[in-house]
Design a protein with these regions (language model features):
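Short, structured secondary-structure boundary patches
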Residues: 29-31, 114-117
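A C-terminal functional module that forms or caps the active site or interfaces directly
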Residues: 91-107, 121
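C-terminal helical cap(s) of enzyme catalytic domains, especially alpha/beta-barrels
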Residues: 20-22, 106-107, 117-143
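Residue-level signal for the nucleotide or nucleotide-sugar donor/cofactor binding architecture
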Residues: 75, 97-100, 127-130
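Secondary-structure boundary/capping motif
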Residues: 41, 67, 101, 124-127
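Glycine-centered flexibility sites
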Residues: 11-12, 69-72, 95-96, 113, ...
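Conserved anion-binding
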Residues: 1-93
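Proline-aspartate-enriched helix->loop->beta-strand connector
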Residues: 4, 111-114
Length: 143
């Protein structure tokens, strides 16, 4: 047993596997399922997971390399907006979010939360305080 309370799954898990994990996690545990926007679709489809998870995260996928997450690429926010509107669980938007585009992304998609990584790093690869501050300020002022 561990004291892990939240697990974020990054695709590749079947609904049956997620259900088994949910059963073993216990009542205090939280599951976040990450899916990816590729073109005009979310992959994998989120509907089979809604009853099994506490939240979903939508991120970008690099079509050429197959890399998911941390690509610094945006995706079609119309797809994310439709997913957010249909989701019965909180949806976090990720994928190429920067201090310059986060407010527009929030206004367009209306996610529960936003997630950023690569665009907030300085030249040395560590988080840049000024970029993080600008990101949070712009996210808060999006409404």
């Amino acid at each position: 047993q561990t004291s892990i309370l939240t697990i974020q799954l990054h695709g590749g898990s079947t609904a049956e596997e997620v259900a088994a994990l949910r059963d073993n996690l216990g009542p205090a545990g939280k599951l976040i399922y990450a899916a990816h926007v590729l073109g005009m679709q979310v992959t994998p489809a989120l509907e089979p997971y809604y009853d099994l998870v506490d939240a979903v995260l939508l991120d970008s996928m690099d079509r050429e390399t197959g890399k998911v997450g941390g690509t610094g690429m945006t995706h079609n926010w119309d797809v994310s907006a439709a997913a957010a509107a249909a989701s019965p669980v909180p949806l976090t938007l990720a994928g190429g979010l920067t201090p310059d585009n986060v407010a527009g992304a929030i206004r367009h998609v209306r996610p529960f939360a936003v997630d950023a990584n690569s665009a907030l790093k300085g030249f040395d690869g560590s988080l840049d305080l000024n970029l993080c501050t600008a990101f949070v300020r712009n996210a808060k002022n999006a409404n």
